[in-house]
Amino acid sequence: MTPVTYGKIYHSNELFRHFSNERAFVGKKICLMRLSAIGDVCHAAAMVTRIQTHWPDAELTWVIGKVEYQLVKLMPNVRFIIFDKKQGKAAVESLKNAVKGETFDALLMMQVALRANMASRVIKAKRRIGFDWARSKELHWLFANERVAPRQHSHVLDGFMDFADALGVPKVATPSWNIPVSEEDERWGEEQAAALGDYVVIAPAASKAERNWLPERYAETADYLSQQGKSVILVGGPGDLDKTTANAILACKPTIKADFTGKTSLHQLLVLLKHASLVLAPDTGPAHMATTVSTPVIGLYAHSNPIRTGPYNNIDNTVSVYDECIEKQKGKKWEQLPWGIRAKGDNLMEGVTTDAVFSKINALL
């Protein structure tokens, strides 16, 4: 059976108070479905924090991926149901057993992938809230009985906040996060920070190789940072691409103080990011993790629009060639094309120059 992990939960059957939106009266038993990936889970966590800030007695259940759970597992007052997509039909059956006999006041369908849509059928809810028509893909609309308000050219995080809007949760001026780690991991991070001194994190690997910057340019940037008096460390996950990317950078013999690739848990990585002066990364999870702990990020982009997927609080600090790549490939500016359209090509990141990155570094440090 799927492991069901509980945070400390406040139980309540009372109803939400009235709000001035069109759906002013709903119940407080809420389930959200966002399985992956790390960056998107960071965005979803901001929405959860918003709900908890204004409705602290809400009963929240989060259906989440096995790996992603490791990042948010200590969030208070949330019941997590782990959905291991590698189990296929068995994962759906386990989810069904985990929510057996329950009816939620609202199910927030925050993932449009068909796998998530199909799995959502076993969750009983009075309101099944999905994305608006423009953002509905893979038959997403078939599984919802209500849609969030339409929105143009929004960041993924703002799109997730639309679900809180649909519930009537009061808006926030800026998002915030509450993603705790253990005292042991906090101490570990403090020890590493003390040993490293003033350091910058390079998280070089995205989930696809085409989104990665050139190893020699990462190496050149590490040397540039070292000349500015900064220690530089590499971080990444245990996957082959992460390790291969780190090794390619190290082969260039840059000034790297430590390589943490594949050597940290997600919580240890989060603490390393928290104590850093700056993070340099392509479109990858650690960039968004750094945002949750208020560390400045320089994002490197070519394939996706940083206005949509960039580090939320550091969009202006991205170095992006997305605009020119899209216009060259499509013959139109991205504003004239469907929102979220990606540029294609294995070598697009070659357009991101070290001079442009150095300029951002100088502005931030």
PLM regions: where:
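Catalytic machinery of carbohydrate-active enzymes
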Residues: 1-365
